[in-house]
A protein has these predicted regions:
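PIN-domain endoribonuclease scaffold, especially VapC-family toxins
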Residues: 1-86, 93-98
Length: 102
């Protein structure tokens, strides 16, 4: 999946926002800035997936497998857009087959 050049990859604007918040609070633990992440994504051909109203609304219908609001947004976006969500978070696969643990 990752090496297939036909696949299109997206990064949620919520992920950029999360990096910005966490880097500001703990730069020792999160050494990457939001600007660096955006630059990396653009240079790598990764598309931005903006948070839309319907994504925000979809969070309310998710089962409570995970309490992190950023991760819940990623799940809602992937589900609403019909995308696969690649994650290393063990709490996300219960949301469905579209969540791929990496």
């Amino acid at each position: 999946m990752l090496q297939d050049t036909e696949n299109v990859f997206y990064v949620s604007s919520a992920s950029i926002w999360e990096v910005a918040i966490k880097h500001s609070a703990r730069p020792d633990e999160i050494p990457v800035t939001a600007e660096q992440m955006i630059r990396f994504c653009r240079n790598s051909g990764i598309w931005e997936l903006p948070v839309q109203f319907r994504h925000s609304q979809a969070v309310s219908s998710l089962p409570p497998h995970h309490n992190d609001p950023f991760d819940r947004m990623l799940v809602a976006q992937a589900r609403e857009e019909g995308l696969s969500l690649l994650s290393h978070d063990r709490q996300l696969p219960p949301y469905g087959e579209f969540v791929i643990f990496v």
